[in-house]
């Protein structure tokens, strides 16, 4: 992927680069949101079947783990920073490591496992969601950072909207499959994945031009094969 992005940047077409960046970003966010929705709804029941309810995490730690997974899956700026050759930012990994370790130790002391995970998340938010996109926009794209903030805010609103619609659907329309064994759990999981995947796909397709371009590109490449 880094090589492909590097070739695109070498062409020097800023509009094309930004268009691909938005497609790449929104597609990663959509995929991460679907995966995390399924993790949130299905992990506890799977662990109960696998090792028993005694090994379930507390709700706070579990939610923080899902948030961490989402952040880890949506770090789209790193590939473009590498492709632009912006290697002068040597202090970001050091600051991230210091924040990660320091916050995890302090918060872990007071809040246990939830504090440790929270410390990791805070360090990622500062560096991966704060500094790195700012660095990319100012030194790579050479555009105002507020454009990134507005676009990510729009994506997060679409994720929240899709989550709300899916929650209402599961609460009032479809109660799911009764999970008394692992076979029923698999059927239930596939249903949850399919339903939320379709709902979120429709929300993203309706409200985001870059996501529509990504879908058209995907089917175009699929038809070529």
Question: What role is predicted for each listed range?
Answer:
Residues 22, 39-72, 141, 177-183:
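Interfacial segments at transmembrane-helix termini and the short loops linking adjacent helices
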Residues 27-39, 114-138, 152, 156, ...:
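Short alpha-helical transmembrane segments in multi-pass integral membrane proteins
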Residues 66-95, 105, 110:
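Membrane-interface junctions at transmembrane-helix termini in multi-pass inner-membrane proteins
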Residues 76-85, 133-149:
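Alpha-helical transmembrane segments
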Residues 101-106, 158-175:
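Hydrophobic alpha-helical transmembrane segments in multi-pass integral membrane proteins
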Residues 141-144, 168-225:
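Membrane-proximal transmembrane or re-entrant/amphipathic helices at the cytosolic face
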